[in-house]
Amino acid sequence: MDQDNERNVSRLWRAFRTVKEMVRDRGYFITQEEVDLSLEDFKAKYCDSMGRPQRKMMSFQSNPTEETLKKSPNMGSVWVEFCDEPSVGIKTMKNFVIHIGEKNFQTGIFIYQNGITPSALKLLPSVAPATIETFNETALVVNITHHELVPKHIKLSDEEKKELLKRYRLKESQLPRIQRMDPVALYLGLKRGEVVKIIRKSETSGRYASYRICL
């Protein structure tokens, strides 16, 4: 395997691990073994005899954990797909959209290499009420939530959000905001109106929590 390909495979392996962590952090069932897959095992499982990655084989489905379903009983399954083609056009995206709809997935996560055409992006809303999220492979090589300067973010369930507003006698408009395109909001798949709890470390009080609403 040449050095460039070796580097690309290593980056793809790291992106794959981030995706598994991201799906698990959203409350879906992912085993620790899946997260800890070694580079050698990744090559054996997802590369051909020439050492080239076969992205189609990396697609996977995950269901919410029992604990997640207690808090969010309507949370459906997620389908994650890594795209083989460097650039994504209408045909490829249409196939992905059809798959999400036909299999009744609530969320589709589409991971691309270089770019998606504007026409292909226009297809995304057609799966409503399901949602499709797109991520560039490069953006997933490092898990941003593991950075020491990024505090812990936890998405609240609808019930937890109601309790929060009631406890502090707040209206939604009084909560600080987090933009939907914020990297951590994208990582957690936050939708408009959802609230995230942010836990920061404090030198004086140990830990403290703040809340932000996604807009």
From Swiss-Prot:
Record-linked PROSITE patterns: RNA_POL_H_23KD (PS01110)
GO MF entries: DNA binding; DNA-directed RNA polymerase activity; RNA-directed RNA polymerase activity
Claim: Transcription is one of the keywords in the record: yes
Principal cellular location given in the protein's record: nucleus
SUPFAM superfamilies attached to this UniProt entry: Eukaryotic RPB5 N-terminal domain (SSF53036), RPB5-like RNA polymerase subunit (SSF55287)
Compartments where found: Nucleus
Positions of transmembrane segments: none
GO biological process, one term: termination of RNA polymerase I transcription
Top-rank taxon, per record: Eukaryota
GO (cellular component) term, any one: RNA polymerase II, core complex
Subunit text: Component of the RNA polymerase I (Pol I), RNA polymerase II (Pol II) and RNA polymerase III (Pol III) complexes consisting of at least 14, 12 and 17 subunits, respectively.
Similarity comment text for this entry: Belongs to the archaeal Rpo5/eukaryotic RPB5 RNA polymerase subunit family.
Reported function: DNA-dependent RNA polymerase catalyzes the transcription of DNA into RNA using the four ribonucleoside triphosphates as substrates. Common component of RNA polymerases I, II and III which synthesize ribosomal RNA precursors, mRNA precursors and many functional non-coding RNAs, and small RNAs, such as 5S rRNA and tRNAs, respectively. Pol II is the central component of the basal RNA polymerase II transcription machinery. Pols are composed of mobile elements that move relative to each other.
The name this protein goes by in its record: DNA-directed RNA polymerases I, II, and III subunit RPABC1
Provenance organism: Eremothecium gossypii (strain ATCC 10895 / CBS 109.51 / FGSC 9923 / NRRL Y-1056) (Yeast)
Name of the gene this protein is made from: RPB5
